[in-house]
Amino acid sequence: MDYPSFHEDPTKDESTVAEQRKGQSNEEKPLIDLNDSLDEQRNAYNEHCKNHDQQPSQQVRNMEDEANQYEQTDSSSDQEVMNEKQSLDKENRNDNIPHENNPGQQEINEPIFDFHMFLEQLRSSSAEPVAKYLKSFLSEFTKRRWTVNYQVKLIRDFLKFINEKIEQYEPWASGSQAEIDNAKEGMEKLVLNRLYTSLFSPEIAKSGIPLSSEHSDDVEEDRVLSEKMELFQWITEENLDIKKQKSSSKFFKLAADELRRINDYHAPRDKIICLLNCCKVIFSYLRNVVKEESADMFVPILIFVVLQARPAHLVSNIQYIQRFRSPEKLTGEVMYYLSTLMGAMSFIETLDCSSLTITEEEFNAQIEKSIKKMEERKLSEKSESKTAVNENATYKDPVLSRGLSSSIDVSTGVALVNLPEELENMKYLQIDTPESKEYPRSTRPRGSSHSGSFTTDSGKRSRRNSNKYVGSSDRPPYRVSRAYSSSATHSPIVHEEQPVDDGLQQNDDLREATTASLETAEAERLQAREKAEAITALRAMFPAFDSEVIEVVLNAQQGRLSSSIDSLLEMS
């Protein structure tokens, strides 16, 4: 650095000296012109000091610029490191869903649902209030026939109410948010498992109960779609412009099996999982075999899989899911796959020659063959039905034959005595048909501690309460004791419990314990069966791998079928 030639005044501040050095070294205009008057020299110096206080020197500015540049470089380096780390984490993560180039393919890795744990928690003494709320609701719900819209309203209102109670009572109140969410999922599954025969249209039809207009429409649409799928079961991949690959048949069969399992489960969540597994198997095929993913390729394969699977009651299943699955869960990936399946069903229902890659002559020939097969099947079913009726008519149960003549007079007398009361009771019972026809139902007491309004000594009271629950009443069909009502604004209406005979109470408790044990055993059985079926399906797709290896992969992927397929494809 070139120092100035004149002597520096030690009383001047460093910034002034630096500015003077700069002016002299760069041979700029002198700070003070000695030819000027003393006042002009003083003004020039004051102006310089004023400007110097407001503006930093060039050296300071350079130092600040260098510091800013260093900070930006350091920040940029940190950002690059973070981006690289996120990229590595993403690559190392077990991605068990299709890529993000499709709006419906993004999945949130939710915690594994443990229904068995929820049932164990519900049996604990601290959860007794929640169990009583549940028992009361189920008891009251099954005493009436509700319209579909009112069924949906009652169940959603109860689940909202009971979810608030789950957060208030142990063992969930002090648990983690994951345990609370698991309990809410478990409660929805438990409620809909118990009420399945009253909510699922084919189950109602099977019981012989007259159907409401909505349930009747479900059953009729099931029949139409089933006949369409049978009519077009001859369709091949080429007819839908699907490029056939070496391993496509294994993937399509596995996807069809997953979709067909939708009728094995009662909870909407479980039915959705069957649909998701079906769709994810298809996307695994596109990703790993075809090496290309798009909705244009996914939809034709889904249509082909539906035709191959031909699942029964598909329309009723979709309606059941939309009605009773929590609306907060019907979003994102689930809604995408659900709407895509509905589009595939609509395509099948309106399918004609122009929808396929096929000549009109071949199309008509295949349709004629299918119609002939369908007629032969119906004739065979009628013949088998007549044979079964004849066999039942000729068979006589020796036990019933011995006791029939001796008991006929007594049973007839009892029936005649009770007939007026039964006819009177029928006037107060309703069914959810558009014509509001009355539906006969027995009003015998159930002997439950939560059925106080249906005691033997209060027939009129029973009928009065019967009417109150049906229609537009805002009162929910559940009743709890005052001891468990913690909030007047959110709790159901409180009723005093009627005294119940100890023997009836013991029988009721035994029945509840037996039901709970059966539900636990059923949950364990389904879990074991799902694992065995998944291993069998994966062995069929990957015969080169040992069963132990497949099981290890399945366990590592927490039972997720599609991610297990991806892992095995990478290993092969």
Curated annotation (Swiss-Prot):
Record-linked InterPro entries: CUE, DUF5601, UBA-like_sf, VPS9, Vps9-like, VPS9_dom_sf
Name of this chain's protein: Vacuolar protein sorting-associated protein vps901
UniProt remark on domains: The CUE domain (Coupling of ubiquitin conjugation to ER degradation) is monoubiquitin-binding and is required for intramolecular ubiquitination.
Oxidoreductase keyword on record: no
Name of one Pfam family that matches: VPS9
Disruption phenotype: Results in mis-sorting and secretion of vacuolar carboxypeptidase Cpy1.
Designated gene of the protein: vps901
Signal as UniProt keyword: no
Compositionally biased tracts (Polar residues): 69-80, 445-457
Signal peptide positions (record): none
Keywords assigned by UniProt, alphabetized: Ubl conjugation pathway
Region described as Disordered: spans on this chain: 1-108, 430-502
